[in-house]
Each structure stands twice: as structure tokens, then as C-alpha cells.
């Protein structure tokens, strides 16, 4: 049933669900190739001299008379150490046609690793990297004295169980290519009950322990290797642990781009300095945002007279929908300007929903989430008084002719949305109606945004199954359309769609009507339009590909999003990224179509009311 604000309630949810047969786990790195040949035991009966003979010892000779004093070759550990591929490797850029799963449209590869909370196992291209890291024959390496000092240092790291140092950013989980173009429907994901993994994946909590103090920190991308680099890395790591607050404290530990433990540690440590970056929106703003109009407060619904405390301005409407209308108001005692959400009490369930919304908002003390000021109940309605946000909708702001939208602007907006979502999920709250209309700018000049409208939000317990059948079709996830169990990853799908629209100005699943839109969501067939995404970075495409994934277990959590390379090092990116995105022009067309649809619904409702009143039906009812 469609409503004025675009949200619909799915009256007859589809009972069809997508099942995925279990895929075989990826094979480990291949064994090392044999050396050119052992020395002749007749010519060289004694043990090989490492200074004179670079060839390997005779295996038969060692089996007959093993030397108890002989120490294991430290280079032999290379056979099992396979560093994860870096971004830009040829293997990662061209995945095989059979490496994609039907549940993962973003290029998910392989079966989820055991105990990795739904994260995919080591990527197939790691095999190629492993072959390159296999120990060379000693004849090729030369004598120990002739070995390069840098090579010896790397081999020592490997022997101690540490990952060799590498330059560049961590490898991406998915290919940044178009999911439709890389045959994402060919290889299925492993079938695993969702309720077995919810407790692990919720809030982006990693299954494996975080990096220890003995693990080496990875140099951030673009940083030069100075002589005192190791000391600098240790200082940055300590500052990262001390500076992160309660909300973003898990950011450096939550992301798992690879299934290799050493790589996960390096990723977390490389991103921890930028994960604690303060006020990302101030990178683009010349002045700080206005302070919060009032501190966070715990609100209780109480009866009272609205007109004695507030002056409602019904002519200055801010929005409306199924649950009521929103207008501006002023508190008479303080002169504080607020937004008033008026909800009609038609059934007992209406009051129950309002009480749930109040309970949810009392938990959300975050600068990127709208704050509740008061709640008053009258005999016929309930009014929620909230923080007034004057900047308007985010999409309305960025289509302004005087505004130049760049990819860095999009990063700043998306990072703040992720911050708000992460806090909600830590408070066990799911928004379930994330869409452009519910992202507002604090003012008309800055880049600070807030998430609003918790009328459809739900408290969430990972140990309990939760299903919903409402939302806005364009931004609904497949599990909502199918009336399947939902989780915190349901909000992440909506974030992926919003990010896609910010980058391109196109809605990936929008059809001619709601039915076609819902069918598009269920099929999850989408792609990166070549023309509109021409100027968009591969990191941005990879970010979206990790969110718009049909299987919710394969989507990134909010913590993993905040640790993704695309949302980090924003200050450096802002210095070199000033190209205007084409999405501004296309977003104007999208907003015009949306306004036309809203006006059409309003006019249709007025015409229906006019026909009913002219037929005398209302008079017969005594109205």
C-alpha cells in the first residue's frame, strides 16, 4: 500500500527464497617445486657445505643419518606463507567467470571462512601470489653471504611468523568491476543458517582477535619508508588505540578484507590513524557547524496542552506521510525553534508505535542522528518535538546550481551516515527506512548531515528472528521483500543504494511502478553505468559492490565501511580530487520525477475525495 512519503507495506510478501548450494572451499597455496636436482651421493658423501655448495641436501642421505644438531632452514617457512595480493594485482582485476555467487552481486568469491562471521575466505588470486612466494632453489639464491640484506630481512620476518612488509593499500574484497559484467550469478555461496551467524556479524564484531602488540604495523598508503619508520608506526598505533572513542573503537578491528590473519592485522593497523579522523566534514567546510540546539535528553510521553507550551506553524510544513505531518514550532518559554511531528491516534497500535519511536530515540545520542526534545499526548493525537534541521534534504542540497559535487563530497556524506548507522547498531537499533529523504543537512552551507525518521525503527536482538514487510521499494533489501529474517546488514543494503545514487544520480532498481521495482530488487541485477561512473574511482565502486550484495551475510558492516580505504585519507584526497560528478544533473531529473509522483498522488487523493463528497456518500455517513 503506497503512502505519500513513498513507503509501502508489502501486503502479500513473496514466500520464495533463494537457496544457495554449498561451494567448495578454495585450495591452499601449491607446494613448492622441486629443486633442479640433489647432489650425487657418490661424489659428495658428506653433508653439504652451505658455504661451498648452494644446492639442497640429499633427502635420502638425511633419512639415513639425520643430523640432530642441524637447525631447520628458516627459508622453509616461505612454503606456507602466502601474503595476500595487493590492490591492482592482475589476478584480482579479472576474476574467473565461476568465482561469483548468486547471492553476492558485488563479486563475492569463495566460501565464508569458518569462524569469520560470514566474511569470504581467502581470494582465489592468493594462489598465484603464493606461487611467487615459494622458496627458490638454493642454487639460484646463491650463498648466504651474497644474499641481499633487504631480502634477508624479509625472510627473517617470514621465519618469525610475520607478514612481509608491502606498500600500497590493502587488497579489496570484491572486484570493482560491474557485477553484471563479471557473471556474478554463476558460483553460489555456501548455504549457512542465518541465525547461526547473526551474533557474530552484528555490529561488525570480528571473530578473530585483533592485532597484537607484536604484529607489525603496515605503512599507510603514500607514506615513505623512513629510517625510523618502525618507531613512527608504533607511535601511530598507540595514538590510534588511545584516541578512538566508544563508537569508533572497533573500527580498526572490525574489517576483514582477507581471510589471512596477518593481512587482517595489517589492514586494521594501516587504517587506524585515519579511522579516528575528527570531523571529516570540516575538510570541506570553512567554518565549524552550529552547536547542538540542546543536549541529549531522556523523553517520556506525558499528557498536556500543546498550545500552552508551543506555537505550531502548520503553514510551514516540513514533510508528512502515513503516520502524520511535520511542521515547525517554537517553544514559548525559550523561543527555541523545533520540528513538530503530529501523529493521529486512530488505533491503540498508533500509540504503541510512538512509544517505540520514543524509546529508540532516547538511546541515540549521536551528532549524526536527530535528537528528541519532548513528547506530549492529547486526546486525539501525539506530538513529538524534535531538533529542527534547516538545511533540508541532502539530495535537494547537492542539486543546487551553486553547489559542485565531487567524489570527496560523497565520501564525507557517506562517512557520516556510516557513523550514525554504527552507533544505531551498537545500540541494537535498526532504522529500516534509510533513503535520501531521511538524510538532512544541518545547514545550507556546511557538510554536516543527520539521519531522521525513526518511525519504522526496531529494537534488534541477534538471538531472535525479526521480519518486517514495510519500507520504500527502491531501498528495500531482498530479505525484506521476501519477508525473510533481517539483521543489521539490512540497513547496509540501503546505504549501498544511497551511495550508488550519490555517485551516479541513478537509482539501481527503480522501475516504472512498485511491482517492477520490487522484482528488480529480488533479482538483484544491477551494474555500473559506463558513462556515469567514468569519473568514479575503483575504491568507490568496490565500496558499493560490498554493500549491494543479495546475501546479507556477505555485506560489509558499518564498522567495516568506516575502515574501507574509500572513506579514509579524505584530507589527502580532497587536495587532488576536484572533478565534478555527473550525478548532479541526473539527480535533478530524479528529484523532479519524485516530486511529480508525490503531486500526482496528492491530486488523485483530492479527486477521489471530491467524487465521494459529490455523490452524497459522506452525507449518508453523517459527515
UniProtKB/Swiss-Prot annotation:
Residue numbers carrying Phosphoserine: 169, 175, 177
Modification sites for N-acetylalanine: 2
Catalytic reaction(s) noted: L-seryl-[myosin light chain] + ATP = O-phospho-L-seryl-[myosin light chain] + ADP + H(+); L-threonyl-[myosin light chain] + ATP = O-phospho-L-threonyl-[myosin light chain] + ADP + H(+)
Cytoplasm found in the keyword field: yes
SMART domains referenced in this protein's UniProt entry, alphabetically: S_TKc
Disordered, as annotated region: 1-179, 204-251
Gene Ontology terms describing biological process: cardiac muscle tissue morphogenesis; signal transduction; striated muscle contraction
Keywords: Acetylation, ATP-binding, Calmodulin-binding, Cytoplasm, Kinase, Nucleotide-binding, Phosphoprotein, Serine/threonine-protein kinase, Transferase
Amino acids binding ATP: 318-326, 341
Active site feature: 433
Leader sequence segment: none
Annotated GO CC locations: cytoplasm
Pfam families registered for this protein in UniProt: Pkinase (PF00069)
Ranges for domain Protein kinase: 312-567
Compositionally biased tracts (Basic and acidic residues): 32-43, 49-89, 150-159, 215-224
UniProt cross-references to PROSITE patterns, sorted A to Z: PROTEIN_KINASE_ATP, PROTEIN_KINASE_DOM, PROTEIN_KINASE_ST
Enzyme Commission (EC) number: 2.7.11.18
Regions of compositional bias (Low complexity) in chain numbering: 20-31, 90-102, 204-214
Quaternary structure and partners: May interact with centrin.
Described function: Implicated in the level of global muscle contraction and cardiac function. Phosphorylates a specific serine in the N-terminus of a myosin light chain.
Family, per entry: Belongs to the protein kinase superfamily. CAMK Ser/Thr protein kinase family.
Identification of the protein by name: Myosin light chain kinase 2, skeletal/cardiac muscle
Species in which this protein is naturally found: Bos taurus
